[in-house]
């Protein structure tokens, strides 16, 4: 048992668990999955110094498996005394057609979770400004981001917490590599342009497959997205398919890729802004010939 697992076990509340987990069958498989996700979530929170005691986090809840999982895991860590922050669940209802407005309020109220449901019809703005053949993601995300920043300020939150996972980060990395000509992924911790809000991604180490299994076991009332993920021809879909193929051919490569993003060597890349190649010259001191092999 590693340190993270030991802490999670030791800090289990004597009263049992958060109400979210009380009706979930505690099978051996589920307990292992839950502990693994808790460990990876807490590890990301610690690795990237997300916690400042007394902070108030706004947890964005879309109704998808990832955001449900994020909220449940953060509530679980808080219940165990391992996350000393306030949590506010926020859903931005963007006016998408056939969006079931009752599901999230009913779910959050049933389990006594502090929340806010905000209605802003950004869907009509997107569809009015863009032709049907266009991809809505960019404009939709800009409108959503502006509203989330506003809500966070109104609610006195210090951070916006998002449910992006390992695969989201890797897909973004390859999109930037293949289409943007740069090495960049999703940051696990980001300061907004105004400098007053942090953005956190505590699921940075968590696998999408695990989050899907977790959501199924928890029986979250999933709300499907009628926009972003269902539009054909997205670059992200191509990256997702590529990663699935790589993992199928060479199991474990996704974990290796994530580790690579934590182990960057600027001297072995070509970016002169990150490494002083001009100042590097033979002076009798030992260097590194790793790049030869």
From Swiss-Prot:
Compartments, record wording: Cytoplasm
GO cellular component, one term: cytoplasm
Requisite cofactors: Mg(2+); [4Fe-4S] cluster
UniProt KW keywords: 4Fe-4S, ATP-binding, Cytoplasm, Iron, Iron-sulfur, Magnesium, Metal-binding, Nucleotide-binding, RNA-binding, Transferase, tRNA processing, tRNA-binding
Reactions accelerated catalytically: cytidine(32) in tRNA + S-sulfanyl-L-cysteinyl-[cysteine desulfurase] + AH2 + ATP = 2-thiocytidine(32) in tRNA + L-cysteinyl-[cysteine desulfurase] + A + AMP + diphosphate + H(+)
Its EC number(s): 2.8.1.-
Pfam families: ATP_bind_3
Protein's pathway: tRNA modification
Molecular function GO terms recorded: 4 iron, 4 sulfur cluster binding; ATP binding; magnesium ion binding; sulfurtransferase activity; tRNA binding
Any Gene Ontology biological process: tRNA thio-modification
Family: Belongs to the TtcA family.
Protein name: tRNA-cytidine(32) 2-sulfurtransferase
Native species: Brucella canis (strain ATCC 23365 / NCTC 10854 / RM-666)
């Amino acid at each position: 048992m590693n340190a993270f697992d030991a802490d999670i076990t030791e800090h289990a509340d004597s009263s049992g668990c958060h109400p979210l987990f009380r009706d979930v069958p505690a099978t051996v498989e589920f307990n292992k999955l839950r502990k693994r996700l808790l460990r990876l979530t807490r590890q990301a929170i610690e690795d990237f110094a997300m916690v400042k005691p007394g902070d108030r986090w706004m947890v964005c809840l879309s109704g998808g498996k990832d955001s449900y999982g994020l909220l449940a895991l953060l509530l679980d860590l808080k219940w165990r005394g391992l996350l000393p922050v306030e949590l506010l669940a926020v859903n931005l209802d963007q006016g998408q057609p056939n969006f079931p407005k009752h599901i999230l309020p009913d779910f959050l109220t049933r389990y006594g979770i502090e929340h806010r449901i905000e209605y802003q019809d950004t869907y009509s703005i997107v569809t009015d400004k863009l032709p049907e053949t266009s991809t809505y993601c960019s404009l939709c995300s800009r409108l959503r981001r502006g509203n989330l920043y506003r809500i966070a300020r109104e609610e006195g939150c210090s951070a916006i917490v998002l449910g992006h996972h390992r695969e989201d980060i890797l897909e973004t990395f390859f999109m930037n590599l293949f289409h943007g000509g740069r090495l960049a992924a999703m940051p696990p911790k980001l300061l907004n342009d105004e400098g007053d809000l942090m953005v956190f991604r505590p699921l940075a180490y968590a696998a999408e497959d695990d989050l899907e299994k977790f959501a199924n076991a928890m029986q979250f009332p999933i709300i499907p997205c009628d926009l972003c993920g269902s539009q054909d021809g997205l670059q992200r879909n191509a990256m997702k398919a590529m990663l699935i193929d790589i993992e199928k051919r060479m199991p474990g490569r996704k974990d290796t890729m994530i580790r690579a993003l934590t182990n960057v060597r600027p001297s072995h890349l070509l970016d002169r802004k990150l490494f002083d190649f001009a100042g590097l010259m033979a002076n009798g001191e030992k260097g590194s010939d790793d790049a030869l092999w």
